[in-house]
Amino acid sequence: MYQWIQRDSDVHQRWIWCRRLLIVSLVSALMSVLQVIVFRFVDPPLSMTMVGRYLEAWSDRQWNFRLHYVWCDLEQIAPSVPISLVAAEDQRFPFHHGFDFDAIKKALGRHSRGGHLRGASTISQQVAKNLFLWSGRSFVRKGLEGWYTFWIELFWPKRRILEIYANIAEFGDGVYGVQAAARRYLGKGAADLDESDAAQLAAVLPSPRHYNIQHPGPYIRWRSSWIQRQAKQLGGSAYLDMH
């Protein structure tokens, strides 16, 4: 009799913990969706990537570290910037729903042939990671990135996705957003950037702390020229106006 009672008690305890876990999971999922809805209308004061950079600086005792971040509405950013970002990072941005499966397939194909596994993250995925998550590679983060990307694409128009991307992308150590980068590295505002300036900013995005916008090396000069050519082939800023 005692064994039956003990067994029933164990089953009851497991049920309680499963129910609690389910409730926590549902609340967390709901909160994440609410986050996405809020930032559809509210400009983010910070991103998780910025918070992570602060913590990294403090852990390294970089007490004088400063974050450079100035929000700038898309209407106040030169038209050359959005098309340069799309040309550099995600040329199918107007057409996909957050995931570019063609790019993923090509990346996996290159890797299977012995090549380096390059990222195939869309702009939407990068926004999800930079705004809500942490840096680094893990299946957990990738899974959460996919979750946030789905809701971002559902609730935000493409214009809003591109606006937030242009404002929270890192262009240098502690320098986030087109406005801050333009002022710090090019001595002008985001509204005054020409095609060459925009391409130069976009060229460093794969590794912004490694490359220098003010003193670009051969690779950045080459990539900047490539981005300008790609932007023109896409049709310039009209490529984004049509979609």
From Swiss-Prot:
It holds the Pfam family Transgly. Pathway: Cell wall biogenesis; peptidoglycan biosynthesis. Keywords: Cell inner membrane, Cell membrane, Cell shape, Cell wall biogenesis/degradation, Glycosyltransferase, Membrane, Peptidoglycan synthesis, Transferase, Transmembrane, Transmembrane helix. GO terms for cellular component: peptidoglycan-based cell wall; plasma membrane. InterPro entries: Glyco_trans_51, Lysozyme-like_dom_sf, PBP_transglycosylase, Pep_trsgly. It is a single-pass membrane protein. Disulfide bonds: none annotated. It is an enzyme of class 2 (transferase). The chain crosses the membrane at residues 21-43. GO terms for molecular function: pentosyltransferase activity; peptidoglycan glycosyltransferase activity. It catalyses: [GlcNAc-(1->4)-Mur2Ac(oyl-L-Ala-gamma-D-Glu-L-Lys-D-Ala-D-Ala)](n)-di-trans,octa-cis-undecaprenyl diphosphate + beta-D-GlcNAc-(1->4)-Mur2Ac(oyl-L-Ala-gamma-D-Glu-L-Lys-D-Ala-D-Ala)-di-trans,octa-cis-undecaprenyl diphosphate = [GlcNAc-(1->4)-Mur2Ac(oyl-L-Ala-gamma-D-Glu-L-Lys-D-Ala-D-Ala)](n+1)-di-trans,octa-cis-undecaprenyl diphosphate + di-trans,octa-cis-undecaprenyl diphosphate + H(+). It is found in: Cell inner membrane. Its EC number is 2.4.99.28. Its main location: membrane. GO terms for biological process: cell wall organization; peptidoglycan biosynthetic process; regulation of cell shape. NCBIfam families: mono_pep_trsgly (TIGR02070). Belongs to the glycosyltransferase 51 family. Peptidoglycan polymerase that catalyzes glycan chain elongation from lipid-linked precursors. This is Biosynthetic peptidoglycan transglycosylase. The gene is mtgA.
